[in-house]
């Protein structure tokens, strides 16, 4: 009898290991349902988003914005733009921080041309994507509180957060929310809708974040080439026409011209530009009251 009980016990244990107790499955069934607001429902209706896809999309749109990297913008969405960007000055900004790069320019502003600046906070702020912000670039040597390596992995064949990517110019605090909007709407969105989820359209303003910042050593008084003209510089950023092909032709932005006629709130009233400094511990800190987005209140801060 004892032997039979023992065998039955072993069988029962085996069944539990294979199929589980059913508790996890039951918990999964009771997963909290996502309730959409009237505004969200109307927006998804307009975009004709399938009911089963709405919960995931709205979850991403409600979360705090974070940087996701230029590679996320590539693939089935913006391949031509990504390819053009990799060949642009912004697609190689991190490389300029390496020893031996741009020797003449560095000597001109009294920087050591043989020094490695790829972990220097003041440089990383403007030479990478989202440094010192949620989801942003983390240099070599970065560790979590538990000592885990958190440095951003760099693939030389696929530029990403280590360069000045899409989000540095097109988003307020990272493109995670906006990416959900683009995927759900399939490009059928207005400027106002995108601004609600972190897109910015004040490009001439946002460029001053780095190109004319008080801490940049590359000032006009050093050399005329450092005079910043937005209209001239933007022509070097996206030479898209050279990168359309049969594989990405279906990604052309059908609503681009239509949106160009719209005027976003950020175009009427530009957002604040973050000021920053390096503290006594050598870390980059944003000056209080200068951020364009308040993540706690979920509000945007405009220039007065």
Predicted regions span which residues?
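Composition- and surface-driven signal marking solvent-exposed, interaction-prone regions
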Residues: 4, 222-225
């Amino acid at each position: 009898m004892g032997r039979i009980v023992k065998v039955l016990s072993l069988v029962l244990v085996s069944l539990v290991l294979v199929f589980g107790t059913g508790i996890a499955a039951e918990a999964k069934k009771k997963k909290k349902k996502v309730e959409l607001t009237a505004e969200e429902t109307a927006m998804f209706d307009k975009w004709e988003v399938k009911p089963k896809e709405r919960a995931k999309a709205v979850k991403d749109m409600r979360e705090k914005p974070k940087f996701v990297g230029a590679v996320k913008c590539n693939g089935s969405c913006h391949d031509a733009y990504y390819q053009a960007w990799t060949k642009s000055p912004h697609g190689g900004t991190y490389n300029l921080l390496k020893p031996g790069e741009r020797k003449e320019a560095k000597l001109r502003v009294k920087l050591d041309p043989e020094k490695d600046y790829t972990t220097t906070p003041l440089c990383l702020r403007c030479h990478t994507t989202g440094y010192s912000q949620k989801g942003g670039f983390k240099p070599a040597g970065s560790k979590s509180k538990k000592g885990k390596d958190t440095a951003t992995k760099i693939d030389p064949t696929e530029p990403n957060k280590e360069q000045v990517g899409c989000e540095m110019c097109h988003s307020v605090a990272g493109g995670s929310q906006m990416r959900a909007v683009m995927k759900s709407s399939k490009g059928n969105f207005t400027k106002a809708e995108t601004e609600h989820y972190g897109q910015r359209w004040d490009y001439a303003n946002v460029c001053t974040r780095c190109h004319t910042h008080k801490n940049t050593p590359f000032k006009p008084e050093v050399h005329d080439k450092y005079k910043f003209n937005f209209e001239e510089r933007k022509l070097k950023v996206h030479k898209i026409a050279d990168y359309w092909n049969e594989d990405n032709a279906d990604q052309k932005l059908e609503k681009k011209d239509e949106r160009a006629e719209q005027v976003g709130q950020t175009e009427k009233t530009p957002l604040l530009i973050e000021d920053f400094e390096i503290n006594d511990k050598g870390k980059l800190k944003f000056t209080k009251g200068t951020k364009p987005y308040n993540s706690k209140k979920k509000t945007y801060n405009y220039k007065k």
